[in-house]
């Protein structure tokens, strides 16, 4: 189905595109570039749970957000809008789009919501506008928006290095997770300024992660000392397994072999926690949506 067909008077409908959340199964800082950006090593795990981005095409070149994806975020600052405009400028297309999002991923939790929404817009509009740009180009555009955007564009679980943009696809075993959002947001630049943060970890290899020896997150000790609410979540989760931090926080998770085990464990958590049971994905559901529209 081409873009003109989707924009016809007989088919003015919105199309829905998944924007999955992610976990960082470990994260360490191994150095710093000359420009001040920190060098990381991490593993991105994509989930079967996340936001849904809705797209409706326009012929007048306008990019508009319908509703607010996040309270207090102006349209021009919204990563979805910025992604659409960046793609539009790069491709030189006269087509436009309306964008809205059903949010499930909590903001500021390290689950990648804003980055995933932006990546989904890039992938969806590349298809709907009929641009045919390669995924490498979309990933490069995404990197200008945020270091986590490329992994969502590519849609595969990955070992990541650099500032998070050097990606090596990896296979991960099926797993389920109990996620908890403590509801605390500490800006990442503030955490990078902490004197307690370890910035010179010894570089690891994928084999080290595969052996199970890499589980720590460099931001965890900083956040647990800084934020009592995060420490309280770790204490609660420690009763059902080994809690970990995702991204630069504040989201926490515990891994289980099966969804049933995760659901059973979550039943033992305090009822006031904002928690979910989700499963890891072998690849992004966004890739499945892309395949469906290209049939």
From Swiss-Prot:
Residues binding ATP, per UniProt: 106-116
Key words of the record: ATP-binding, Isoprene biosynthesis, Kinase, Nucleotide-binding, Transferase
SUPFAM superfamilies for the chain: GHMP Kinase, C-terminal domain (SSF55060), Ribosomal protein S5 domain 2-like (SSF54211)
GO molecular function: 4-(cytidine 5'-diphospho)-2-C-methyl-D-erythritol kinase activity; ATP binding
Annotated active site: 22, 148
Pathway it works in: Isoprenoid biosynthesis; isopentenyl diphosphate biosynthesis via DXP pathway; isopentenyl diphosphate from 1-deoxy-D-xylulose 5-phosphate: step 3/6
InterPro entries (UniProt xref): GHMP_kinase_C_dom, GHMP_kinase_C_sf, GHMP_kinase_N_dom, IspE, Ribosomal_Su5_D2-typ_SF, Ribsml_uS5_D2-typ_fold_subgr
UniProt catalytic activity: 4-CDP-2-C-methyl-D-erythritol + ATP = 4-CDP-2-C-methyl-D-erythritol 2-phosphate + ADP + H(+)
Entry EC no(s): 2.7.1.148
Keyword Transferase: yes
GO biological process: isopentenyl diphosphate biosynthetic process, methylerythritol 4-phosphate pathway; terpenoid biosynthetic process
Family: Belongs to the GHMP kinase family. IspE subfamily.
Physiological role: Catalyzes the phosphorylation of the position 2 hydroxy group of 4-diphosphocytidyl-2C-methyl-D-erythritol.
HAMAP family: IspE
NCBIfam families noted in UniProt: ispE
Name listed for the protein in its UniProt record: 4-diphosphocytidyl-2-C-methyl-D-erythritol kinase
Native source organism of the sequence: Xanthomonas campestris pv. campestris (strain ATCC 33913 / DSM 3586 / NCPPB 528 / LMG 568 / P 25)
């Amino acid at each position: 189905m081409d873009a003109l067909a989707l924009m016809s008077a007989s088919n003015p409908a919105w199309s829905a595109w998944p924007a999955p959340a992610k976990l960082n199964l470990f994260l360490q800082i191994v150095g710093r570039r000359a420009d001040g950006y920190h060098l990381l090593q991490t593993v991105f795990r994509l989930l079967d749970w996340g936001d849904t981005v809705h797209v409706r095409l326009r012929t007048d070149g306008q990019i508009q957000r319908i509703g607010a994806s996040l309270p207090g975020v102006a349209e021009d600052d919204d990563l979805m809008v910025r992604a659409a405009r960046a793609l539009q400028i790069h491709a030189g297309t006269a087509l436009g789009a309306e964008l809205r999002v059903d949010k499930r991923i909590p903001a500021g939790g390290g689950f990648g919501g804003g980055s995933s929404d932006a990546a989904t817009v890039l992938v969806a509009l590349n298809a709907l506008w009929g641009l045919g740009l390669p995924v490498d180009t979309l990933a490069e555009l995404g990197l200008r928006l945020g270091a986590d955007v490329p992994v969502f564009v590519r849609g595969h679980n990955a070992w990541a290095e650099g500032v998070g943009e050097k990606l090596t696809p990896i296979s991960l075993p099926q797993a389920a997770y109990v996620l908890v959002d403590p509801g605390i947001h500490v800006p990442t630049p503030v955490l990078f300024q902490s004197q307690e943060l370890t910035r010179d970890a010894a570089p690891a290899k994928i084999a080290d992660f595969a052996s199970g020896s890499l589980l720590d997150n460099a931001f965890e000790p900083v956040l647990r000392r800084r934020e009592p609410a995060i420490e309280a979540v770790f204490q609660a989760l420690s009763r059902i397994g080994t809690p970990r931090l995702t991204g630069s926080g504040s989201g926490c998770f515990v891994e289980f072999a099966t969804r049933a085990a995760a659901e059973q464990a979550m039943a033992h958590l305090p009822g006031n926690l904002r928690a979910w049971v989700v499963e890891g994905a072998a690849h992004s559901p966004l890739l499945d949506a892309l395949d469906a529209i290209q049939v």
